[in-house]
């Protein structure tokens, strides 16, 4: 009986001891849990920060790549647009050139008729009333023909007094001139024409060689002596 009481007393002491230590153990566990939570939260934040940095870095790289692709596409567009514009202009020029070639071929065949009218106007001097009436009729046709050429973009060249240009003129004759300097056109032998600013037919012209060379006194005396020698030689042969 006494032993049982003693055991009960011991058990109570143990319970009291356990109860006394329980708050300390509980507090220690709470502190440990808090520390673990803080470490876990810190690690999570570090992981999230690293992931965010990686995401930003990847986005920056992707943005840089897209900017390069955009610049490449932009340059391609500019080149294609320029090529198309050049192609369109070239096509327009080719069509204009073809049109001018076709028109010029036809007009070139008409120009000799115009030349004949102009020569007739310069050479013919009708005297009778009937001849004058016929002449006026021909000149009326000539004016109509010139007007048609004008409507097609044909314009005559005015070359007399102009400096010779092989791109516009063809020199048929060259002769000295006191009036015109060297390489200036003295006379128009056949009229030249433009078509839309381009040469339809070159003008045939007589070109100045400049003032004729005047002999010096020595050259005149030399020619006189040579003439006398030739005369003496001829006289000797006759004898």
Swiss-Prot record:
SUPFAM superfamilies: Coiled-coil domain of nucleotide exchange factor GrpE, Head domain of nucleotide exchange factor GrpE. GO terms for cellular component: cytoplasm. This is Protein GrpE. The keyword Cytoplasm applies. Residues 226-239 have a biased composition (Acidic residues). CDD domains: GrpE. NCBIfam families: PRK14140.1, PRK14143.1. Residues 1-60, 208-239 are annotated as: Disordered. Residues 43-53, 216-225 have a biased composition (Basic and acidic residues). It comes from Prochlorococcus marinus (strain MIT 9301).
């Amino acid at each position: 009986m006494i032993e049982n009481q003693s055991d009960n007393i011991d058990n109570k002491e143990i319970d009291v001891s356990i109860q006394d230590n329980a708050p300390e153990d509980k507090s220690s566990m709470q502190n440990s849990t808090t520390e673990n939570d803080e470490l876990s939260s810190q690690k999570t934040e570090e992981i999230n920060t690293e992931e965010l940095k990686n995401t930003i870095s990847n986005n920056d790289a992707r943005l840089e790549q897209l900017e390069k692709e955009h610049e490449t596409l932009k340059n391609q567009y500019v080149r294609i647009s320029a090529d198309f514009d050049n192609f369109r202009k070239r096509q327009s020029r080719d069509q204009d050139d073809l049109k001018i070639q076709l028109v010029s071929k036809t007009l070139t065949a008409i120009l000799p008729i115009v030349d004949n009218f102009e020569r007739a106007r310069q050479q013919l001097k009708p005297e009778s009333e009937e001849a004058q009436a016929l002449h006026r009729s021909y000149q009326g046709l000539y004016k109509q023909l010139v007007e048609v050429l004008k409507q097609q973009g044909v314009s005559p060249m005015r070359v007399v007094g102009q400096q010779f240009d092989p791109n516009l003129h063809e020199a048929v004759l060259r002769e000295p001139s006191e009036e015109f300097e060297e390489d200036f056109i003295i006379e128009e032998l056949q009229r030249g024409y433009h078509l839309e600013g381009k040469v339809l037919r070159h003008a045939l012209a007589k070109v100045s060689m400049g003032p004729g060379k005047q002999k010096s006194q020595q050259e005149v005396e030399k020619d006189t002596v040579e003439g006398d020698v030739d005369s003496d030689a001829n006289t000797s042969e006759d004898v």
